[in-house]
């Protein structure tokens, strides 16, 4: 006599929770296995890392040889005065803009690189 999967499922459905626990313990003993779920460590961190970054920081790493053009580009992007933009260019590495979209960060990077600066997006 062969028992089908459906018959086994029906038998499980008719059991109380205590009977199912006892059955599982008996199966663990008979087959030498454990019914404990495998724990995947770090799963939450990996899922967070997979999410696409939405805010970027544009970091000026060096002003390069054409300092005047870089200062003008900084002023245009940030609205800072001449003195503040000059101080920012001399303080490299420094964040020119923080929390901007990817498109805005790429556009600013392109503008600063064309002016002669070294730039990173983080």
Swiss-Prot record:
InterPro entries: Ribosomal_bL12, Ribosomal_bL12_C, Ribosomal_bL12_C/ClpS-like, Ribosomal_bL12_oligo, Ribosomal_bL12_oligo_N_sf. The keyword Ribonucleoprotein applies. CDD domains: Ribosomal_L7_L12. One of its GO terms (cellular component) is cytosolic large ribosomal subunit. Keywords: Ribonucleoprotein, Ribosomal protein. The keyword Ribosomal protein applies. One of its GO terms (biological process) is translation. GO terms for molecular function: mRNA binding; structural constituent of ribosome. Gene3D superfamilies: 3.30.1390.10, Single helix bin. Forms part of the ribosomal stalk which helps the ribosome interact with GTP-bound translation factors. Is thus essential for accurate translation. Homodimer. Part of the ribosomal stalk of the 50S ribosomal subunit. Forms a multimeric L10(L12)X complex, where L10 forms an elongated spine to which 2 to 4 L12 dimers bind in a sequential fashion. Binds GTP-bound translation factors. HAMAP family: Ribosomal_bL12 (MF_00368). Belongs to the bacterial ribosomal protein bL12 family. This is Large ribosomal subunit protein bL12. The lineage of its organism: Bacteria, Pseudomonadati, Pseudomonadota, Gammaproteobacteria, Alteromonadales. The gene is rplL.
């Amino acid at each position: 006599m062969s028992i089908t999967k459906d018959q086994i499922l029906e038998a499980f459905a008719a059991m109380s929770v205590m009977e199912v626990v006892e059955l599982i313990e008996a199966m663990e003993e008979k087959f030498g296995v454990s019914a404990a779920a495998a724990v995947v460590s770090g799963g939450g961190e990996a899922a967070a890392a997979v999410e696409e970054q939405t805010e970027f920081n544009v970091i000026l790493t060096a002003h390069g040889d054409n300092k005047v053009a870089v200062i003008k580009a900084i002023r245009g992007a940030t609205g800072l005065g001449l003195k503040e933009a000059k101080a920012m260019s001399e303080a490299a590495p420094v964040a020119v803009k923080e929390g901007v979209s990817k498109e805005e960060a790429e556009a600013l990077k392109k503008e600063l690189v064309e002016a002669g600066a070294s730039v990173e997006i983080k």
